[in-house]
Amino acid sequence: MAAPAGGGGSAVSVLAPNGRRHTVKVTPSTVLLQVLEDTCRRQDFNPSEYDLKFQRTVLDLSLQWRFANLPNNAKLEMVPVSRSREGPENIVRIAFQLDDGSRLQDAFCSRQTLWELLSHFAQTRERLQQLGEKTPVCVYMRNEVTGRAALQNTTLQSLGLTGGSATIRFVIKQCDTAGKQESIAVRSKAPGSPVSSLSADQASSSTLLPLNSGEFSRGDLNHEGDANTSGTGLEGGPKPTDAQTKQSTSEPASAPFVPFSGGGQRLGGPSASLRPLTSPSANSSKSFSGPGGPSKPKKPKPGEEPQQEPEPPVDRDPVVYHPDLEDLLQPWPAEVPDEFFEVTVDDVRRRLAQLKSERKRLEEAPLVTKAFREAQMKEKLERYPKVALRVLFPDRYILQGFFRPSETVGDLRDFVRSHLGNPELSFYLFIAPPKMVLDDHTLTLFQANLFPAALVHFGAEEPTGLYLEPGLLEHTVSPSTADVLVARCMSRASGSPPLLPAPDPVSLESEPIAEDGALGPPEPIQGTAQPVKRSLGKVPKWLKLPASKR
């Protein structure tokens, strides 16, 4: 009996008809037919007379291990084949795709090698005769067959092609060094594969390896070859030559790194210009230099985070405006008919749908972490670097100013006090609805929900006639002018929705705290002079509306 599989990788256990179990190591690119052939070769059976069965399912032997949907250490069983695989079922239709996009198609036997298939077509045969220092490569799915020796020893059946149709990509690439190819060959050999019987010289010039992606990329193969070359050097394998060592040591010496107090990498200079010239092999050799694996960058401690520079003060741009100074677009209707206030079935349905959507949003809201909430807050702060605040006085005058989100409620009080006619007046600020007095002067405007724009009410313990200074009241503007100033001064991030529309006198509605229509007269409702009577439709028996007319 074969020895059990050890080490890394996947393995499969096959039960032979004689009652013996054989363990086969597999890779993601191993074809199930190779597992069957390896077991039959060990137990002296004919592979064409048996199939592999997993539980109650007979497996498709043309599938690779990654597509067979089998667990690791799966227990397979050899069962007699229901129909012989000899005969017309072994005919496979192959299409070779060339570099120019053209395809060469024909039917072949599954026992034929890839070299015989390439020699069958005149176009590919001419390319094989004019190779020179180049190497022919055939790519099927994630398997790559490189070199003449591998093409002559790889059959369609070894690739899992025992019937149907398939497309194989044929390319000509430059020859790599023998050391790189040898390292790739050592990594790419799979147990039980048909290329395992090749000699060391043949393996150095031809390889059969699985690709990491479905797309053929020469750069990826070179990078993997460099990484494996450096990895084998640690185990006593072929070491780089003296010329390569001198070249790798001379490159960093020519551009010394000069640190600076800011941390990070220096921009510009000789080090930045020579950085793209560093070979991937040098990077891979550095990653394997430590005994414990590649080194990880150190994470800064919470106490060592760089302190942010204080933000420059923002221009307040104080402006006073009055809602009565705005010219109405249309005259208000003299009287609204009673039908306008009637609650119809459509109104109830619309309101019910809104309540359902709001309840669903609150119930299905995901639980977020503290770090996620802080990231959202930081994103909001970066999107709106300024805060537009408007203070509504009892005499309907509105004072507008700009602040930073990090400024406090105390700064807002100082701003209001500096524009009062009587600076000694005792007052308080609050937001509504619901009424909430801003008595904590240490809260930032962001923490007080005055972000990115809000309307704050002014309250005084001793009411007076005029609150603002007379010099400021002489320059009172219209609400539309104040809105234009907000749209001009508040810088927004690119792609974010506009905070305040310039021509529209409607006040800020970006936050729930801001009152609708409090900062300017609302637009008249279109068509209220001649209301359209809405049909009640069919009213359910359980719905009773006191104001509805039937």
Swiss-Prot record:
Q: Per the record, where are the segments of Basic and acidic residues compositional bias?
A: 217-226
Q: Which Pfam families does the UniProt record give? A: TUG-UBL1, UBX
Q: Identify its membrane topology class.
A: Peripheral membrane protein
Query: What are the start and end residues of every segment in region (Disordered)?
Result: 185-320, 496-550
| Residue intervals passing through the bilayer | none
Interaction with GLUT4: annotated segments: 313-376
Alphabetical UniProt keywords: Acetylation, Cytoplasm, Membrane, Nucleus, Phosphoprotein
Q: Where is the composition biased (Low complexity)?
A: 193-206
Name the residue ranges with Polar residues bias.
Answer: 242-252
Q: Which InterPro entries match?
A: TUG-UBL1, Ubiquitin-like_domsf, UBX_dom
According to the UniProt record, list the residues that bear Phosphoserine.
Answer: S193, S496
In what residue span(s) does the UBX domain sit? 382-458
Q: Where, subcellularly, is it found?
A: Endomembrane system; Endoplasmic reticulum-Golgi intermediate compartment membrane; Cytoplasm; Nucleus
Report the record's Gene Ontology biological process terms: glucose homeostasis; intracellular protein transport; regulation of D-glucose import
Say where the protein is mainly found: membrane
Q: Identify the domain of life.
A: Eukaryota
Q: Which residues does this entry mark as bearing N-acetylalanine?
A: A2
Gene Ontology cellular-component annotations = cytoplasmic side of plasma membrane; cytoplasmic vesicle membrane; cytosol; endomembrane system; endoplasmic reticulum-Golgi intermediate compartment membrane; nucleoplasm; perinuclear region of cytoplasm; vesicle membrane
Describe, from its UniProt entry, the tissues in which this protein is expressed.
Ubiquitous.
Assembly and oligomerization: Interacts with VCP. Interacts with VCPKMT. Interacts with GLUT4.
Q: What does this protein do?
A: Enhances VCP methylation catalyzed by VCPKMT. Tethering protein that sequesters GLUT4-containing vesicles in the cytoplasm in the absence of insulin. Modulates the amount of GLUT4 that is available at the cell surface.
The name under which this protein is listed is: Tether containing UBX domain for GLUT4
Gene name on record? Answer: Aspscr1
